Amino acid sequence: MDIVSLKFIGIGFMAIGMYGAALGVSNIFSSLLSAIARNPSAAENLQRMALIGAGLAEAMGLFSFVIAMLLIFS
């Protein structure tokens, strides 16, 4: 295999990282909705923590995207 095909295989693996970030964010917000349904008085605190968690999960997806762009253009 040449280096170009290996670059594209690496980019495909980076897509798995983006998929994982999307799954993580969806799990965070589905858990948030069920937690708010169980305890509406704690909604403000739960929402703040969920947004922090979603930001961290989305950062992993952005890191995967940046690495994929570095692989494409290097």
UniProtKB/Swiss-Prot annotation:
It holds the Pfam family ATP-synt_C. Belongs to the ATPase C chain family. GO terms for cellular component: plasma membrane; proton-transporting ATP synthase complex; proton-transporting two-sector ATPase complex, proton-transporting domain. The record marks E58 as: Reversibly protonated during proton transport. GO terms for molecular function: lipid binding; proton-transporting ATP synthase activity, rotational mechanism. Keywords: ATP synthesis, Cell inner membrane, Cell membrane, CF(0), Hydrogen ion transport, Ion transport, Lipid-binding, Membrane, Transmembrane, Transmembrane helix, Transport. F(1)F(0) ATP synthase produces ATP from ADP in the presence of a proton or sodium gradient. F-type ATPases consist of two structural domains, F(1) containing the extramembraneous catalytic core and F(0) containing the membrane proton channel, linked together by a central stalk and a peripheral stalk. During catalysis, ATP synthesis in the catalytic domain of F(1) is coupled via a rotary mechanism of the central stalk subunits to proton translocation. Key component of the F(0) channel; it plays a direct role in translocation across the membrane. A homomeric c-ring of between 10-14 subunits forms the central stalk rotor element with the F(1) delta and epsilon subunits. Disulfide bonds: none annotated. This is ATP synthase subunit c. It comes from Rickettsia prowazekii (strain Madrid E). PANTHER family: ATP SYNTHASE LIPID-BINDING PROTEIN, MITOCHONDRIAL, ATPASE PROTEIN 9. It is a multi-pass membrane protein. The chain crosses the membrane at residues 8-28, 52-72. It is found in: Cell inner membrane. F-type ATPases have 2 components, F(1) - the catalytic core - and F(0) - the membrane proton channel. F(1) has five subunits: alpha(3), beta(3), gamma(1), delta(1), epsilon(1). F(0) has three main subunits: a(1), b(2) and c(10-14). The alpha and beta chains form an alternating ring which encloses part of the gamma chain. F(1) is attached to F(0) by a central stalk formed by the gamma and epsilon chains, while a peripheral stalk is formed by the delta and b chains.
